[in-house]
Amino acid sequence: MEAKIYYERHLPHWQPLGKVLFITWRLAGSLPAGFWRECTEKSAGKRFVAFDRTLDSGRTGPMWMKNADVAKLVSDALRYGETERGLYRMLAFVVMSNHVHLLIEAVKPLEKITRLLKGYTARCANQYLARTGQAFWQDESFDRWVRNSAELERIIHYIENNPVKAGLVNHAEDWAWSSAAKSKAETILQVR
């Protein structure tokens, strides 16, 4: 089966293989009803800012990944997708209380990556939380094709500093479920 480079459901998706993609997954029910209708007049960039601010505010919907075990499960699955499954090369990620930001160079089609990771983490998290028959993740993702190195650096900074911006930690590397924490650990190991 050939991977689709472009398709639309509720949101447009550009997903060329071998390109860097900025992806956001959110928990089901994490945005207030009518959120997208209120954003129809905004540009794509302004829609994303409103989307991310609403998620970071933590005022709507479930916050399953506030639970350290669930956040670790998702974080470990993201790393496993890179190191063991070879689905992508991960450049940055963060697991927040109700959403995940991920920056990858896709080796496999994004549809496959999303299906495998969201499916696995949903099953495991729902089992851990003693939930059955309920959606864990929203069925669609926000994704953006990163087009140049300046945008790449800006997005890495944005992702890794999301917990700081949300007021959860003072320093990005203090958030355990992010690539910033991994970078700090690797630096410490190299110094030793």
Cite the ranges covered by each PLM segment.
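Short catalytic/metal-binding and nucleic-acid-binding patches
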Residues: 1-192
